[in-house]
């Protein structure tokens, strides 16, 4: 079962939803990078459960502990291990799931593939696994800040159950995003979006939507041709997230409806810098960043656990009715925002280190 992501900067996440804890081992982090538990904690706090009435009411502080890889507040260049204790695990709430497959969860597929599964909250398939990603992204972000200090990664909720926030990706700010519990940057229709979630919650249901992300201050040259294209690695990163079902960059599927004359991004000179007048490419051409804003969208399905009766089957093949129990998000989107940002940073720092290695090679050996 693969649990590692990255090439030069690698994370390996571990732990189960209702086990003793979850965490991450980070390998490939350069030495002498300032790093504290507070750097990690501020990102975990944005992801943790129980933040508001529209997130799961599981009460976890998600306190990060660095167990290895630092000394006197600096990275050593050795593996960094980060641990978060599960403080509010309630495995007994899932006793019924030992014999029943939850619809649209990983219960059946894990059992069919491995012949065993952790039925207490889904184990590794739980979104609690993303704590390791966010912690790893916090460390990756510190390295990225050192290599390319002008890079800024901002994600936000842009759509809830068909309702769009209608904000300008090029001008949205961190303050706009963090101004409300939904991480919805448009105050004008925030109330309508919240009502959509609350309506589903009252009916024992859930809703999905879209998280958008923009990266400003991108350098030219991140990404590798063919199989390690920047957008390909971003797609893998985002589609590996729990509940994610779609990824598009730049024009995305809209580009299929355009002509080449409409879709091409004309070049022009801004001083001594090559720029593009439009950005349908989303900041990537040939799998390599072109210096424009990196812009993409991630679609998330409705949370699969709902408080309504559903038809399913038992492990013995008997058709049964299930009303799910447990504490779950009516909408995963606000907590997905920092996770999307973390995975973006992990992809970028990995490619940044690869690019720095290339830049060590002289352009000419004459």
Curated annotation (Swiss-Prot):
Its EC number is 4.2.3.5. GO terms for biological process: amino acid biosynthetic process; aromatic amino acid family biosynthetic process; chorismate biosynthetic process. Its cofactor is FMNH2. Keywords: Amino-acid biosynthesis, Aromatic amino acid biosynthesis, FAD, Flavoprotein, FMN, Lyase, NADP. GO terms for molecular function: chorismate synthase activity; FMN binding. NADP(+) binds at residue 47. The keyword Nucleus does not apply. One of its GO terms (cellular component) is cytosol. Pathway: Metabolic intermediate biosynthesis; chorismate biosynthesis; chorismate from D-erythrose 4-phosphate and phosphoenolpyruvate: step 7/7. It comes from the Bacteria. The keyword NADP applies. This reaction introduces a second double bond into the aromatic ring system. This is Chorismate synthase.
């Amino acid at each position: 079962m693969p649990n590692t992501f990255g090439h030069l900067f690698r994370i390996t996440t571990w732990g189960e939803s209702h086990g003793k804890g979850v965490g991450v081992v980070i390998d490939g982090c350069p030495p002498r990078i300032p790093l504290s538990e507070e750097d990690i904690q501020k990102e975990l706090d944005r992801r943790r459960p129980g933040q508001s009435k529209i997130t799961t009411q599981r009460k976890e502080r998600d306190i990060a502990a660095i167990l290895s890889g630092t000394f006197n507040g600096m990275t050593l260049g050795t593996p960094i291990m980060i641990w978060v204790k599960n403080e509010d695990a309630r495995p007994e709430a899932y006793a019924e799931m030992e014999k029943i497959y939850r619809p649209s969860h990983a219960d059946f597929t894990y059992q069919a593939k491995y012949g065993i599964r952790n039925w207490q909250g889904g184990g590794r398939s739980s979104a609690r696994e993303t704590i390791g990603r966010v912690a790893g992204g916090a460390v990756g972000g510190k390295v990225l800040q050192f290599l390319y200090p002008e890079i800024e990664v901002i994600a936000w909720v842009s759509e809830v159950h068909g309702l769009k926030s209608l904000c300008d990706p090029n001008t949205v700010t961190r303050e706009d995003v963090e101004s409300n519990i939904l991480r919805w940057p448009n105050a004008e229709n925030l109330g309508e979006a919240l009502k959509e979630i609350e309506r589903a919650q009252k009916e024992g249901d859930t809703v999905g939507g879209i998280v958008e992300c923009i990266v400003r201050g991108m350098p030219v040259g991140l990404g590798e041709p063919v199989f390690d294209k920047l957008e390909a690695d971003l797609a893998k990163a985002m589609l590996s997230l729990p509940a994610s079902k779609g990824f598009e960059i730049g024009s995305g599927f809209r580009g299929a409806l355009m002509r080449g004359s409409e879709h091409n991004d004309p070049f022009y000179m801004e001083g001594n810098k090559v720029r593009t007048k439009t950005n349908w490419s989303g900041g990537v051409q040939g799998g390599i960043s072109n210096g424009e804003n990196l812009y993409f969208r991630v679609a998330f399905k409705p949370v699969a656990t709902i408080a309504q009766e559903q038809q399913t089957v038992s492990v013995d093949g008997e058709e049964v009715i299930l009303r799910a129990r447990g504490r779950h998000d009516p909408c995963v989107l606000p907590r997905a925002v920092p996770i999307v940002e973390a995975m973006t940073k992990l992809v970028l720092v990995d490619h940044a280190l690869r690019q720095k290695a290339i830049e060590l090679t002289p352009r000419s050996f004459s």
